[in-house]
Design a protein with these regions (language model features):
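Double-stranded beta-helix
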Residues: 129-148, 175-229
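Short helix/loop capping segments that flank catalytic or ligand/cofactor-binding pockets
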Residues: 102, 123, 174-175, 196
Length: 229
């Protein structure tokens, strides 16, 4: 992705959060220059990858395949004694016409909540023991206290306020229901590790390579400078 695309996506996500009164923590507003002076008191932000996260999944067409996210809180699976939180929270922004590709998580379970805007469609499949997609078996779905069964590949429609529970090894993808508008989502989960806990099918990247065509508006969660001693 070009840095200009990343900056544009960040501003759009920021505006969507403001529109739906989802106020962000202070570290989301630090400029790149301000990050240069942040000491070890912000190690949790660095080590747990809190903050902004823009991806095109390495496909080079963000408006068709992409997602904009903010990790607001998180623990660490590898540094549990230092960061003992067992939960994470994100905000996610999906534009109409965008698609977030099919994947599951080995470790975390999560609730995906429609926080406002249009309707999101989440397609679900079970997985086989070899981690391939099960295109045949029915899927047990949990939405807002309701448990029911749907055929493989069904898209679960979430209107604002509705949510779905995604268990481990459940393949799922995201798109916006056409004509309903961009969507702001929430995610509540176990600890999040996007470097090691995404099984995409077909395989693809999670974090984009960035072409620096302008200065960054905000740093992404993978870009923080080391703390000054």
């Amino acid at each position: 992705m070009k840095r200009s695309e990343v900056n544009k996506a960040l501003r759009e996500l920021e505006a969507m959060c403001e529109a739906y009164h989802c106020y962000l923590p202070p570290f989301c507003h630090f400029t790149p220059k301000e990050w240069e002076d942040k000491g070890h008191e912000y190690d949790e932000v660095r080590d747990c990858c809190l903050g902004w996260d823009i991806t095109d999944y390495g496909q080079g067409d963000f408006d068709k395949m992409g997602f904009s996210l903010i990790t607001i809180r998180n623990g660490s699976q590898t540094m549990q004694s230092k960061y003992p939180k067992v939960y994470a929270e994100k905000l996610l922004y999906l534009k109409e016409g965008q698609y977030s590709p099919n994947h599951f998580h080995w470790y975390k379970t999560e609730d995906i909540i429609n926080r406002g805007g249009g309707n999101v469609l989440i397609r679900v499949y079970n997985s086989h023991p070899d981690e391939s997609i099960d295109y045949e078996s029915d899927v047990t779905v949990h939405t807002d206290g309701r448990t029911y069964t749907v055929p493989a590949g069904t898209q679960i429609r979430l209107t604002p306020g509705e949510s779905i529970y995604i268990q481990q090894y459940l393949y799922h993808d995201f798109e916006v229901e056409p004509g309903t508008g961009d969507v702001l989502l929430g995610e509540v989960s176990q600890c999040n590790d996007d470097s090691n806990d995404n099984r995409f099918n077909p395989p693809m990247g999670r974090f984009p390579a960035i072409e620096e065509d302008e200065a960054p508006y905000r740093l992404l969660c993978t870009e923080y400078p080391a703390a000054k001693d």
